[in-house]
């Protein structure tokens, strides 16, 4: 099972090594605007899942939201510690 930290490490590695066919690399290359739209999309889907689709579907949507948030962090050179200090 992945954790927030292990996912961030995996995505950071992909950003550095840029494996061919990586959806993470593709998203990073599309830029902040694209990533931001994905975050908004997944936030809405998380909300709808929480309202109407139950806990498992909500958790799935939240995992996708966290993925895109981490891609945005990497795009802008933020670390987990940069975010944690604001919690």
Swiss-Prot record:
InterPro entries: HisE (IPR008179), PRib-ATP_PPHydrolase-like (IPR021130). It is found in: Cytoplasm. It comes from the Bacteria. GO terms for molecular function: ATP binding; phosphoribosyl-ATP diphosphatase activity. One of its GO terms (cellular component) is cytoplasm. This is Phosphoribosyl-ATP pyrophosphatase. Transmembrane segments: none annotated. Belongs to the PRA-PH family. It catalyses: 1-(5-phospho-beta-D-ribosyl)-ATP + H2O = 1-(5-phospho-beta-D-ribosyl)-5'-AMP + diphosphate + H(+). One of its GO terms (biological process) is L-histidine biosynthetic process. SUPFAM superfamilies: all-alpha NTP pyrophosphatases (SSF101386).
């Amino acid at each position: 099972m992945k954790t927030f930290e292990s996912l961030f490490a995996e995505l950071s590695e992909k950003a550095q090594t840029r494996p061919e066919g990586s959806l993470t690399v593709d998203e990073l290359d599309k830029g902040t605007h694209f990533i931001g739209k994905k975050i908004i999309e997944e936030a809405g889907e998380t909300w709808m899942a929480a309202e109407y689709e139950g806990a498992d579907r909500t958790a799935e949507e939240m995992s996708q939201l966290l993925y895109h948030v981490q891609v945005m962090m990497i795009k802008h050179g933020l670390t987990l510690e940069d975010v944690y200090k604001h919690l």
